[in-house]
Amino acid sequence: MQVSIEDIIENLDLEVLVKGKDGIKLGLSDINRPGLQFAGFYDYFGNERVQVIGKAEWSFLNAMPPEIREKRIRKYFQFETPCIVLARGLKPQKELLDCSKEYNRWLLRSKAQTTRFINKIMNYLDDKLAPETRIHGVLVDIYGLGILITGESGIGKSETALELIKRGHRLVADDAVDIKEIESVLVGKSPYITSGMLEVRGMGIIDVPALYGLSSVLSEKNINLVIYLEQWKEGRDYDRLGTDDEHIKILNIPVRKMTLPIRPGRNVAVIIEAAAANYRYNLSSKISPVDTINKRIEESTNYD
């Protein structure tokens, strides 16, 4: 994944002071503040990163005699950089402006404070450069947890999601879930075209926020638990104690997985709701229901 300089300019509302080379792409979300480089130190210089000049670097350059400033800036421009951004609406020094034109480098300006701009551009690049995949399923926010419901086509994922929405939970995505890995966290969202829509077989597509209100949908959600729905298979040894530790890898990130068998008479939505509540409980509790039962058995045995 790569992001063009033109995309950054458009999405971050940057002013172009000097237009650089066409076709420059960014593959890193990190930034570099070139204060050390202006001081003459070039070891470990991240020249492949976006260069951000804040008030500190700008003031340092301003304090230099003109001949020293030109020498330092010219040495800095010997290294290829994707773009230079002046934060806080700062006015570029003449030497910086002249070298940007001479070396055909992008020189941009942001009105935002330096720290805020850095956070903004890093979040933007993290999102755009994050590894991504699309999974067939339904993503629902239940008790603040992102529950990804998967399973065979026609198993009842969307119908289950509809029941969960009626119970006050929120839909993130139906049918197709776009998932990105950002700093080892999986974030799921709906493709733009199907955002807020839910397909129910025999009924068609329904507009969830139109029927249930804007609070019934969410734009994106971290994925905490995967629940796989399958038809009940006789003879299969399903987990009855909650001790199975099954995981699935999405974008090489392990996620807790539960397999939920479906058969007539089971209220799947209620079971998933309980599974989410139990998962949240287990995150904070050191004592599982199995431990409690074992303790009671031990107490009963000692009493006898």
Swiss-Prot record:
InterPro entries linked to this entry: HPr(Ser)_kin/Pase (IPR003755), Hpr_kin/Pase_C (IPR011104), Hpr_kin/Pase_Hpr_N (IPR011126), P-loop_NTPase (IPR027417), Ser_kin/Pase_Hpr-like_N_sf (IPR028979)
Chain's role: Catalyzes the ATP- as well as the pyrophosphate-dependent phosphorylation of a specific serine residue in HPr, a phosphocarrier protein of the phosphoenolpyruvate-dependent sugar phosphotransferase system (PTS). HprK/P also catalyzes the pyrophosphate-producing, inorganic phosphate-dependent dephosphorylation (phosphorolysis) of seryl-phosphorylated HPr (P-Ser-HPr).
Similarity comment: family membership: Belongs to the HPrK/P family.
Protein name: HPr kinase/phosphorylase
SUPFAM superfamilies given in the database record: HprK N-terminal domain-like (SSF75138), PEP carboxykinase-like (SSF53795)
One of the protein's GO biological processes: regulation of carbohydrate metabolic process
Important for the catalytic mechanism of both phosphorylation and dephosphorylation, as annotated region: 198-207
Cofactor: Mg(2+)
Annotated coiled-coil segments of the chain: none
Miscellaneous comment text of the record: Both phosphorylation and phosphorolysis are carried out by the same active site and suggest a common mechanism for both reactions.
Catalytic residue positions: 136, 157, 175 (proton acceptor), 240
Domain notes per entry: The Walker A ATP-binding motif also binds Pi and PPi.
Record keyword Kinase present: yes
EC number(s) given by UniProt: 2.7.11.-, 2.7.4.-
Residues given in the record as Mg(2+) binding sites: 158, 199
Gene Ontology MF: a single term: magnesium ion binding
Subunit structure: Homohexamer.
Alphabetical list of Pfam families matching this protein: Hpr_kinase_C (PF07475), Hpr_kinase_N (PF02603)
Residues involved in ATP binding: 151-158
Name of the gene: hprK
Catalytic activity: [HPr protein]-L-serine + ATP = [HPr protein]-O-phospho-L-serine + ADP + H(+); [HPr protein]-O-phospho-L-serine + phosphate + H(+) = [HPr protein]-L-serine + diphosphate
Keywords: ATP-binding, Carbohydrate metabolism, Kinase, Magnesium, Metal-binding, Multifunctional enzyme, Nucleotide-binding, Serine/threonine-protein kinase, Transferase
Important for the catalytic mechanism of dephosphorylation, as annotated region: 261-266
